[in-house]
């Protein structure tokens, strides 16, 4: 019996050595960047803190260098860390690394839309979306007027709080939601509209779930975990509900479409779909249009909403910054004129604060996953087609050489010695290259105008002592999620 046990142990030992030998051969068959040795099935899971994966990337970069290989389960990934290599990936190799790595939580969006899509469908849909959004006012006066109009409605709702504590999540968030809704549907909604509040709740919950430890695990092992109970089921259900809403809106617009008078982005896509009605391989299908609308609605609402909400919390933490903003707003805009984009040139401090909020919160620390579209030689390494590429934005936004004391909130990071706004090429909050955020211009405009409007009319009042405000995110994964809080808005006396 003892001999049998020894024999079994030897067989297991030999099988393990053989498996490791084969694994090493596969691992070293390409000139991959260095990295920790992966274990079967789980890959490098043990080297990652699933509660703070970006921090794990920083630690591994210190050991293996700015470009290193990891296995997320069985998925090979190359992590790129630091300003120069990240810029090279996003700009110098923008075609080679323009693919989108898979996100299991959005599998039903695969091959459609503009966020989680790949290939020719993505390129054509993105190109059309950029052109149409630009024509509808993306970055032009049309969007400025949209935001100014929405700021008026937002201020009305904020005045009704009458200085009492309230949660700003869906109040402040309704402004960017209405701006993108007007672009997509040529329609804005009342701040009490239940369908809109439901959608915003889904966006908010999804952003949190995508950043939770369980979803980090699920993304790496979807084939094993999909049958188990867990928050991935809630995420998938939410994504399905948002997509169903978008499809319903598409069908409603299709019924009432007037090709000679398109009402917005959605109508323009439907007109293109009609042109393809005899095509054997149409691009503008109901599915693709619905997912594109869902992508734009989610991205156009949640990222700006979260940034504004985080920004207000930061300003309550640093009342001296808020005081300087009030002084600049009073001097340049005054108490009653609507803030305008042209004011940015005369308001370097607010411009710097808006940039510093985005840099400091580092909303998408690891960017969205990229993917190699072909075998690529990068910095002497061979990165095979299909490899996930992770250009870490936090390593650029928190570069100590560019931003002294990057862990601190300092608007001076974007001001020169004369107090003028100082642009930094390290500011990559919207990513860059082929996968840069399509709404970057709109988001920049919204953040500046909405923050200016709020501070023009209100003082921010925290329910706790400013020094006790904790700015730490409650979850770090896909994004950094700010803590929930309440605040009071005290009307400012007219000057």
UniProtKB/Swiss-Prot annotation:
A cytochrome P450 monooxygenase involved in the metabolism of fatty acids. Mechanistically, uses molecular oxygen inserting one oxygen atom into a substrate, and reducing the second into a water molecule, with two electrons provided by NADPH via cytochrome P450 reductase (NADPH--hemoprotein reductase). Catalyzes the hydroxylation of carbon-hydrogen bonds. Hydroxylates fatty acids specifically at the omega-1 position displaying the highest catalytic activity for saturated fatty acids. May be involved in the oxidative metabolism of xenobiotics. Belongs to the cytochrome P450 family. Its cofactor is heme. It is a peripheral membrane protein. One of its GO terms (biological process) is epoxygenase P450 pathway. It comes from the Eukaryota. The omega-1 hydroxylase activity is stimulated by cytochrome b5. It catalyses: an organic molecule + reduced [NADPH--hemoprotein reductase] + O2 = an alcohol + oxidized [NADPH--hemoprotein reductase] + H2O + H(+); (5Z,8Z,11Z)-eicosatrienoate + reduced [NADPH--hemoprotein reductase] + O2 = 19-hydroxy-(5Z,8Z,11Z)-eicosatrienoate + oxidized [NADPH--hemoprotein reductase] + H2O + H(+); (5Z,8Z,11Z,14Z,17Z)-eicosapentaenoate + reduced [NADPH--hemoprotein reductase] + O2 = 19-hydroxy-(5Z,8Z,11Z,14Z,17Z)-eicosapentaenoate + oxidized [NADPH--hemoprotein reductase] + H2O + H(+); (4Z,7Z,10Z,13Z,16Z,19Z)-docosahexaenoate + reduced [NADPH--hemoprotein reductase] + O2 = 21-hydroxy-(4Z,7Z,10Z,13Z,16Z,19Z)-docosahexaenoate + oxidized [NADPH--hemoprotein reductase] + H2O + H(+). The keyword Chaperone does not apply. The lineage of its organism: Eukaryota, Metazoa, Chordata, Craniata, Vertebrata. The keyword Endoplasmic reticulum applies. It is found in: Endoplasmic reticulum membrane; Microsome membrane; Mitochondrion inner membrane. Heme binds at residue 437. This is Cytochrome P450 2E1. Its EC number is 1.14.14.1, 1.14.13.n7. It is an enzyme of class 1 (oxidoreductase). CDD domains: CYP2C-like (cd20665). InterPro entries: Cyt_P450 (IPR001128), Cyt_P450_CS (IPR017972), Cyt_P450_E_grp-I (IPR002401), Cyt_P450_E_grp-I_CYP2E-like (IPR008070), Cyt_P450_sf (IPR036396), Cytochrome_P450_fam2 (IPR050182). Keywords: Endoplasmic reticulum, Fatty acid metabolism, Heme, Iron, Lipid metabolism, Membrane, Metal-binding, Microsome, Mitochondrion, Mitochondrion inner membrane, Monooxygenase, NADP, Oxidoreductase. Gene3D superfamilies: Cytochrome P450 (1.10.630.10).
